[in-house]
C-alpha cells in the first residue's frame, strides 16, 4: 500500500491506449507512481538502474543491478524468454515493434559486454534455478 510503482511513461500510456486495456489495467491507475523516460537511476547512486529497452512493448525495460559481491547483473525482462532466444536473437511472438526490439537487443548486448555483466533471463528455468532460494539472496 505504501509502494510507488516505477513505470516508463510509454508503457503507462500503452497500458491505457485502448478501451479493453483501460479496463484490464484499471487498478494500476489508482497506484501511486513515478513515470520516467529513458533510463532511470532508482536511488541516484547507479546501483539499481532501469534500462529503456522498447520493442516488446513501447515502454519495455530491463534492469541493471550492481551487487557488492555478485557484481553487475542484468535482468532481461521480456527482451529474451529463453537462452536460445538470446543466442539466436529471436523476437518474442508478442511484440509491438520488431525493429525496436532488435535495436534493444543490440544495446542490451553492448551494455552486458561493456560491463562484463551476468545476464539473467527471468523466463529461463535454468537461470532461475541458479539464483539463491528465499530467504537467501544475491549479495
Predicted ranges, named:
Residues 1:
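Classical protein tyrosine phosphatase
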Residues 12, 56, 126:
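Short, glycine-/Ser/Thr-/acidic-enriched flexible segments
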Residues 62-139:
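Cap/insert and terminal regions of metallo-dependent hydrolase folds
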Residues 4, 8-52, 100-116:
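Metallo-beta-lactamase
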Residues 34-83:
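Catalytic core of the metallo-beta-lactamase
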